[in-house]
Amino acid sequence: MTSIVEALVPGGKANPGPPLGPALGPLGVNIKEVVEKINEKTRDYNGMQVPVKVIVDDKKNVEIEVGTPPTASLIMKELGIQKGSGNAGSEVVGNISISQVAKIARMKKEDVLSYDLKATMKEVMGTCVPMGVTVEGVEARDSQKALDQGKFDDLLAGEEW
């Protein structure tokens, strides 16, 4: 029987404690070795929470799948902030450029249901709203409308999805 352990771990800094250790212990695998592999695969996401899936088969073979961090974490890393606004309607904690939004959208390509870059960018902008982050100096919802109206089409020209 194959067992699957899913967890959100700090990029490059997973440890044998919770949530991994208690979940992997009963499966009889070398926890230290698994944690080292996870840290190796997630080191590029240092400072962010990263979803990982550890798949252990009957013969104790381990496969590790690493997802991309949540969109909010990517936005915070891009802006260099620790957290979003506690009062999103009236407090702005940062401003993100349309090229940064596109960069995050490309990172999330494998994890979203959108069919193109423009739709994924709208999802990223939607995450900016409750965080108190503006896009190109205006509220994220207004930037979504501008994207729909073609204001940023020059940035998207020739983009393969």
UniProtKB/Swiss-Prot annotation:
GO molecular function terms listed in the Swiss-Prot or TrEMBL record: large ribosomal subunit rRNA binding; structural constituent of ribosome
Keyword Ribosomal protein: yes
GO cellular component, one term: large ribosomal subunit
InterPro entries: Ribosomal_uL11, Ribosomal_uL11_C, Ribosomal_uL11_C_sf, Ribosomal_uL11_N, Ribosomal_uL11_N_sf
Transmembrane segments: none
Secretion signal span: none
Coiled coil: none
Keyword Cell inner membrane: no
GO biological process: translation
Function description: Forms part of the ribosomal stalk which helps the ribosome interact with GTP-bound translation factors.
NCBIfam families in UniProt: PRK01143.1
PANTHER family assigned to the protein according to its UniProt record, in alphabetical order: 60S RIBOSOMAL PROTEIN L12, LARGE RIBOSOMAL SUBUNIT PROTEIN UL11M
The family this protein is said to belong to: Belongs to the universal ribosomal protein uL11 family.
The protein's name: Large ribosomal subunit protein uL11
Species this protein is from: Methanosarcina barkeri (strain Fusaro / DSM 804)
Species lineage: Archaea, Methanobacteriati, Methanobacteriota, Stenosarchaea group, Methanomicrobia
